[in-house]
Amino acid sequence: HFPDGQLFIDLQENGLPLHPREVLHRFLRALGTPADRIPVGVEECAALYRSKLDGRRVLITLDNAVSFAQVRLLLPGSGKCGVLVTGRDGLNDLLESSDTLRVRLGALSSDESVSMLRSITRDSLTATDPETLRTLAALCDHIPLALRAAGIRLQSRQHWSADDLVARLRDPEQRLAELSHGENSLRSRFDRCFQNLSTRVAAAYHRLGSIDTPEFDLTTGAKTLSTTSAEAEDLIERLVDAHLLEVVGRDAWGGFRYRWKELLRFHARAAG
C-alpha cells in the first residue's frame, strides 16, 4: 500500500519528548533534503516536509507520542500517506482534528502470552509444562514488554528453567526488578509514563498504589486519596486514560470498579 517507503520515529528519547523541529529535520533528511536546505523555523520545516510528501504514498509511524501538539506538524497534507500514531494518553485532539480511527489495544490472552514467550525464546520452552508458562505469563501481567523481558532473561540464563524464573517472580518485592534490565527496561517505561502525568495525577497514582488489593471501588479510592468521590473519580479516570488503571465493571451501587496490573501497582508504591 505504501510503495514510496516508510518513516519511523520514537517520539521519546532518553525519557524526554522530542521537539517537532528535531523530528522534522530527521524526516527531511530521510526524504533526501540536504542539510543546508532545511529551514530553521519549525513552520517552514513543516511546509517543506508536506511538499516533499505531496503525491507520495508513505507510511509514517509516530511512536510514543505524548500530545497532539507534538504530532500536529508531523501529519502530511496529502491524503495518500498513512499515519500510525501510538501513545498512552493526550491524543484526544488528534481524533477531533482529522479522519482518525482509534484502536485501543487490550491485554494479551493467556494463550497469546505463552505464544509470545515461545517466540522470544525461539521455541526453547517447547518441553516446558504449559501450566508453568501460563503462570509465568500471569506474573508478567500479560504485558508484552514484561513478557519480552522474561523471555530475554531465560535466553541469557540458559541454565535457568521457566520454573526458576517463576520462583523468582513470585516475590512481589522483586518482580519489577527481575523484569527491568537494560536501557529500555520495564521500570524505565513505567517511569516515563509517571513523568508525563500532572502533579495531581502523579500523586494520586502513588497513593492509590498503597491499596492492599489490585481491585478497588470508587469509595475506597476516594478514602485513599482523602477527597470527594467526584474529585477521586476525575483523578482515577485520568489514570485510566493513561492506561495505568483499567475499569473492570461496576459495584452493587452502580459505581465503577478499577483494577491495577500488579507490576504497575508495585511501581506506583515506589513512585513519587
Positions of the model-derived regions?
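Aliphatic-rich helical/repeat scaffold segments used for oligomerization and domain docking
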Residues: 1-272
